Amino acid sequence: MLEGAKLIGAGAATIALAGAAVGIGNVFSSLIHSVARNPSLAKQLFGYAILGFALTEAIALFALMMAFLILFVF
Amino acid sequence: MLEGAKLIGAGAAVRTMTEGSSNTSNANGVPIPIPGSTGIYEDHPGLHPAVDERVVEYQAGIREQMSELMRMDGEHPEVVAAAERVHGESDNIAFLQGLLEDLRAHGRESEAFKYGVPNDAPLPGGGNPAGSSGGVDLANGNEAGSSAGVDLANVDDAAAAESPLDQFGIHPILDLNIGEYYVSFTNLSLFMLLTLGLVLLLVFVVTKKGGGKLVPNAFQSLVELIYDFVLNLVNEQIGGLSGNVKHKFFPCILVTFTFLLFCNLQGMIPFSFTVTSHFLITLALSFSIFIGITIVGFQRHGLHFFSFLLPAGVPLPLAPFLVLLELISYCFRALSLGIRLFANMMAGHSLVKILSGFAWTMLFLNNIFYFLGDLGPLFIVLALTGLELGVAILQAYVFTILICIYLNDAINLH
């Protein structure tokens, strides 16, 4: 009973990935838009984009952490 | 053994009794078909919606009770083995209910517990401990339990060796206890010392005999690269200060970046240990840095630092909520800083481990198509390793740049 509930909970925790996917897509689409408008800033913008990507990805990893907590801690 | 036989006898008696009289309903009020009827539940007892679920529930209850009595974790193989001995995988509700009530009422003195955890089982570490007849002694009960479930524990260890999280295990190399504190030298400490040694060796080699050659060799280039990189970061991110004051923070930030970079990269060496995949380490780092930054803020602004919590130009009625929100988000910075690094490292390493385990298994399936098809997973593992190398560098960078941003916030009060 509890085992099954744990698995369901861990699976449900991965729904959060949808948000992270949208976020990462948004970061890079904005990068392409910006570089298309002003190619001379490409290098600087890429740095910002990578930072934004890392921050967004970290949110997805919080979801992963929740899944691990549900599976192994309780 | 005698008790066990008695117990089984009692269970059998209960079973026959309930089967004989179960023509009305069981304890749950669910009607059970009369013997002799051609109900579908009688022909296929597994189909009964209530019985199956309740059997599992009772068996779990027995395991829980056993784990409480044995003072061990419910997932512990010995507990599982003992619980299985007690209920014997029976699907008879009344029998299971009786066992559970016996366990609840009599605890360690109950027939069921004594059957599940035999006192006369041979102990691995020598003879029977004194006072085993009582069966109430804590240490004794634990020892008896451990010897009883020893076979299953071995089996479980072999299976557990495949878990992708095993690589993060901390094992003591030198056991040390000072007073009540456990201060063993573990593989974690070993790899942290290795990282430190590596960084110090690199810096030592470069600065030997005054260092700073006009034409740098490879090592000097590397150190200069890192130094320049962090110096640029500090100069760009922290504003509103003269160069001298700004550079008081520079050594701390440089050391943090170098330490994290080398920890992360060292973890990418196969069969090594990733220090930053433990939030023991990352949270200790992020919390101490967070406290340091807060102290810097109070030093520079005194009590005026609290204005940090209230953005300028906010209407007064909104202020209490905003202060609360800002306070929470400020405190959460410390947590998110550490967890981001930890989660990235742990997730990446587990992923590589899972996929490489998959490729490894596929290689030995004795089938030429699988053998050739294994190139696919292999390349995915290779690509992921490349990605992880990037993430290792990127996360050190992100950690450092966030420290700079937070420091800038504390100094300039947005």
Swiss-Prot record, chain A:
Any GO molecular function: lipid binding
Membrane topology per record: Multi-pass membrane protein
Residues flagged as site, Reversibly protonated during proton transport: E57
Stored Gene3D superfamilies: F1F0 ATP synthase subunit C
Keywords, in A-Z order: ATP-binding, CF(0), Hydrogen ion transport, Ion transport, Lipid-binding, Membrane, Mitochondrion, Nucleotide-binding, Transmembrane, Transmembrane helix, Transport
Localization, UniProt: Mitochondrion membrane
InterPro entries in the record: ATP_synth_F0_csu, ATP_synth_F0_csu_DDCD_BS, ATP_synth_F0_csu_sf, ATPase_proteolipid_c-like_dom, F/V-ATP_Csub_sf
Transmembrane segments: 8-28, 53-73
GO CC term, one of those recorded: mitochondrial membrane
Sections of the chain in a coiled coil: none
Record GO biological process: proton motive force-driven ATP synthesis
A Pfam family of this chain: ATP-synt_C
Family: Belongs to the ATPase C chain family.
Protein task: This protein is one of the chains of the nonenzymatic membrane component (F0) of mitochondrial ATPase.
Subunit structure: F-type ATPases have 2 components, CF(1) - the catalytic core - and CF(0) - the membrane proton channel. CF(1) has five subunits: alpha(3), beta(3), gamma(1), delta(1), epsilon(1). CF(0) has three main subunits: a, b and c.
Name by which UniProt lists this protein: ATP synthase subunit 9, mitochondrial
Species lineage: Eukaryota, Viridiplantae, Streptophyta, Embryophyta, Tracheophyta
Gene transcribed to yield this protein: ATP9
